[in-house]
UniProtKB/Swiss-Prot annotation:
This is Carbohydrate-responsive element-binding protein. Residues 548-559 have a biased composition (Polar residues). The modification Phosphoserine is found at residues 20, 23, 25, 29, 196, 556, 602, 614, 631. It is linked to WBSCR14 is located in the Williams-Beuren syndrome (WBS) critical region. WBS results from a hemizygous deletion of several genes on chromosome 7q11.23, thought to arise as a consequence of unequal crossing over between highly homologous low-copy repeat sequences flanking the deleted region. Haploinsufficiency of WBSCR14 may be the cause of certain cardiovascular and musculo-skeletal abnormalities observed in the disease. Residues 1-36, 54-80, 328-365, 486-527, 548-648 are annotated as: Disordered. GO terms for biological process: anatomical structure morphogenesis; energy homeostasis; fatty acid homeostasis; glucose homeostasis; glucose mediated signaling pathway; lipid biosynthetic process; negative regulation of DNA-templated transcription; negative regulation of oxidative phosphorylation. It comes from Homo sapiens. InterPro entries: bHLH_dom (IPR011598), HLH_DNA-bd_sf (IPR036638), Max-like/E-box_TFs (IPR052207). The modification Phosphothreonine is found at residue 27. Residues 703-724 are annotated as: Leucine-zipper.
Length: 852
């Protein structure tokens, strides 16, 4: 309703002057400044006869309210002469539909250029009128409906508004109709509030910006219409209840007459959910069934990666409600057989070759595909590592540390070295990425483990890492350690509390270790501390899935089992080669290397058959530097990407479709070999597909030519048949209708014999002449129809004449015509005594059968 509100604003701001000479029916006259400011737009958009016309322009029941003229500035914005009455608008609507309006179905308003939203608004009003009349059983003031079964009662709805016009085309400017529309809406809003909401009136609100206090313009606007709401002048001030125009116009959707607004309206009053609670002025639709983005964001975490986390603050976090599901989800699928000591203080030992990198993204939305393409790292041969696809967010690199004697050259770690490798952590680090994964129920024997907390504050110079997917590299500890290595420790505490969004998943503990007094403060690696604490607890990353062939039984010897602490490594931004399809892990013997191998593990989709917890965690051996134990030699574990299974299924589907396509092509060529005579004559001869198609085309061309010849021959035969039928019809038309023709001489002879017999009999009795007049038509028909060629023919034609001319339906008109002739040619009606004389004269003078 942007255009409608624009019209309302124009009606509020502009003073009223004399009417324009080009509008002979407008009751609301506009200011010339309004016309100049609006340009030719408002002058050109007029409503012609039949649309929103007014029959009696000056018949308002209430007097028009006029405000004093004066300049209106931005700070003096207020209501200017809004007519609360609806008389003219009702007349307009009733005029437009004063004929036979039988249903509230959709109307296109032909002849009036309206936008689709304007048509919707008007059709809603028509539907509401139907609802008021037939459902609420009240008379609608807008338009009346009539059913075809009402008969004469339907004339009551046909009001003679159009007759009152007497051919005058009232042209009303669009802004006048807009103002009347707003008066109509405000009127209904006040009617809804007046009878039952006197105790529930909204408290007066002071509008923002340049709005004047509602005490000044609400009274001016509504006091003459709704004294119950605003009170009379003589009413005590304490009993007066104020009303905000925002309350009245809150349900008015800004959709009507938007064609008159060229730019954005300066006044945007209605909210987004207009007409939610007003059933009297809105047509029911499917809006409540449409999904809401706000609701979707409340119940879904699909878009959580686009939300930046809050900077972590040092604090003590409460104990999570349950740690068993987290451990179960971490070591699910029963692949890497975890041996977790049940000691209360488990430690994680980081080797000298361990590297920790956290991918940090700049503030901005993150694509969820970044997680789907991220990888976990597990040991593999020194083959080219398969990196995940590059991620748009940049990496947050820290200055590389100085080279340490005894270390192999490796990529510069993003974090400085922290402590000698002899230092052990007091608590295992928490790994709680931002992406949620479903957890499975805890397996028997999984005991809750403590988690670190109370991390030191993060320096302000280090930006907070965004919760993004990051891989994990597991490096074995069974090899010689260098003199120095990055290690860190964290104070004992409680794990982070659940996030405000109400998720209950706890951050999984990635690797417990042996207990030892901490030798290094957690502040030595602030980014890691920030990384481990900033992520939301409810979003637990899916644990790596390893083939069950790599599992080691808990009771097996553990002296030669290398230890794998968890480290983080960012993926290399290089093109990703295709991965093998998912399946059992590919095992290959490894050769000794100076640098420990790394296992690379992708976070695949959770599989129900693989999500099993290996071993009883409570039955694991006691203190020991253990993260994940894998029996040497270290195998290569190759897992596909999360979409590798989908890719493999798609590849199999494509192969099947290709095989089916080729089979259909071969079947089609075999069919062609059987149909084409030139090819079927030599079945043993191998013919190429091109030759087969060529021979088939020639064969089809030959068949088409033969078919054309047959069609031409059939057409010629049809033409001959039509010519013969025409000749037969012509011969039949030349034959007589009665069979054997009778000569005209014979007709005359029979008529002379009939006249002589009538003359003789009339001289004896004059009544026979009357009988001859009645019988002459039958004699003429008998003489023309009966044939005397043979006795058989005489019999047949006589019976046919008897059936055709002597039946009562045929005799009645014949006798009637004879009597009419007797009455007109003789004086039987006027002077019956002269009939014998007239009969004798007729037979002697030869006037038989003719009028006397």
């Amino acid at each position: 309703m942007a255009g409608a509100l624009a019209g309302l604003a124009a009606g509020l701001q502009v003073p009223r002057v004399a009417p324009s000479p080009d509008s002979d029916s407008d009751t609301d006259s506009e200011d010339p400044s309004l016309r100049r400011s609006a340009g030719g737009l408002l002058r050109s958009q007029v409503i012609h006869s039949g649309h929103f016309m007014v029959s009696s322009p000056h018949s308002d029941s209430l007097p028009r309210r006029r405000d004093q003229e004066g300049s209106v500035g931005p700070s003096d914005f207020g209501p200017r002469s809004i007519d609360p009455t609806l008389t003219r608008l009702f007349e307009c609507l009733s005029l437009a539909y004063s004929g036979k309006l039988v249903s509230p179905k959709w109307k296109n308003f032909k002849g009036l250029k309206l936008l689709c939203r304007d048509k919707i608004r008007l059709n809603n009003a028509i539907w509401r009128a139907w609802y008021i009349q037939y459902v609420k059983r009240r008379k609608s003031p807008v338009c009346g409906f009539v059913t075809p079964l009402q008969g004469p009662e339907a004339d009551a709805h046909r009001k003679p508004e159009a007759v009152v016009l007497e051919g005058n085309y009232w042209k009303r400017r669009i802004e006048v109709v807009m103002r009347e529309y707003h008066k109509w809406r405000i009127y209904y809003k006040k009617r809804l509030r007046k009878p039952s909401r006197e105790d529930d009136l909204l408290a007066p609100k002071q509008a923002e910006g340049r709005w004047p206090p509602p005490e000044q313009w609400c009274k001016q606007l509504f006091s003459s219409v709704v004294p119950v709401l605003l009170g009379d002048p003589e009413e005590e001030p304490g009993g007066r209840q104020l009303l905000d125009l925002n309350c009245f116009l809150s349900d008015i959707s800004d959709t009507l007459f938007t064609m008159t607004q060229s730019g954005p309206s300066p006044l945007q009053l209605p909210p987004e959910d207009a007409y939610v609670g007003n059933a009297d002025m809105i047509q029911p639709d499917l809006t409540p069934l449409q999904p809401s983005l706000d609701d979707f964001m409340d119940i879904s975490d699909f878009f959580t990666n686009s939300r930046l986390p809050q900077p972590p603050m040092p604090s003590n976090f409460p104990e999570p409600p349950s740690f068993s599901p987290v451990v179960d989800s971490l070591f699910s699928s029963g692949t890497l057989g975890p041996e977790v000591p049940p000691a209360s203080s488990a430690m994680t030992h980081l080797s000298g070759h361990s590297r920790l990198q956290a991918r940090n993204s700049c503030p901005g939305p993150l694509d969820s595909s970044a997680f789907l393409s991220s990888d976990f790292l597990l040991p593999e041969d020194p083959k080219p590592r398969l990196p995940p696809p590059p991620v748009p967010p940049p990496l947050l690199h820290y200055p590389p540390p100085a080279k340490v004697p005894g270390l192999e050259p490796c990529p510069p770690p993003p974090f400085p070295p922290m402590a000698p490798p002899t230092a052990l952590l007091q608590e295992e680090p928490l790994f709680s990425p931002r992406f949620p994964f479903p957890t499975v129920p805890p397996a028997p024997g999984v005991s809750p483990l403590p988690a670190p907390a109370a991390f030191p504050p993060t320096p302000q110079s280090v930006p907070s890492p965004a919760p993004t997917p990051f891989p994990i590299e597991l490096l074995p500890l069974g090899y010689s350690e260098p003199a120095f290595g990055p290690c860190f420790s964290m104070p004992r505490g409680k794990p982070p509390a659940p996030s405000p969004r109400g998720q209950k998943a706890s951050p999984p503990t990635l690797a417990p270790a042996t207990a030892s007094p901490p030798t290094t403060a957690g502040s030595n690696n602030p980014c890691l501390t920030q990384l481990l604490t900033a992520a939301k607890p409810e979003q637990a990353l899916e644990p790596p899935l390893v083939s069950s062939t790599l599992l080691r039984s808990p009771g097996s010897p553990q002296e030669t089992v290398p230890e794998f602490p968890c480290t983080f490594l960012p993926p290399t931004p290089a093109p990703t080669p295709p991965r093998p399809p998912p399946g059992p892990a590919t095992l290959a013997p490894s050769r000794p290397l100076l640098v420990p191998k790394a296992e690379r593990l992708s976070p695949p989709a959770p599989s129900g058959s693989e999500r099993r917890l290996s071993g009883d965690l409570s039955s694991m051996p006691g203190p020991g530097t253990l993260s994940v134990r894998v029996s040497p030699p270290q195998p290569i574990l190759s897992r596909g990407r999360p979409d590798s299974n989908k890719t493999e299924n798609r590849r199999i589907t494509h192969i099947s479709a290709e095989q089916k396509r080729r089979f259909n092509i071969k079947l089609g060529f075999d069919t062609l070999h059987g149909l084409v005579s030139t090819l079927s004559a030599q079945p043993s001869l191998k013919v190429s597909k091109a030759t087969t198609l060529q021979k088939t085309a020639e064969y089809i061309l030959m068949l088409q030519q033969e078919r054309a010849g047959l069609q031409e021959e059939a057409q010629q035969l049809r033409d001959e048949i039509e010519e013969l039928n025409a000749a037969i019809n012509l011969c039949q038309q030349q034959l007589p209708a009665t069979g054997v023709p009778i000569t005209h001489q014979r007709f005359d002879q029979m008529r002379d014999m009939f006249d002589d017999y009538v003359r003789t009999r009339t001289l004896h009795n004059w009544k026979f002449w009357v009988f001859s007049i009645l019988i002459r038509p039958l004699f003429e028909s008998f003489n023309g129809m009966v044939s005397t060629a043979s006795v058989h023919t005489l019999r047949q034609t006589s019976l046919a004449w008897l059936d055709q001319y002597c039946s009562l339906p045929a005799l009645r008109p014949t006798v009637l015509n004879s009597l009419r002739q007797l009455g007109t040619s003789t004086s039987i009606l006027t002077d019956p005594g002269r009939i014998p004389e007239q009969a004798t004269r007729a037979v002697t003078e030869g006037t038989l059968g003719k009028p006397l």
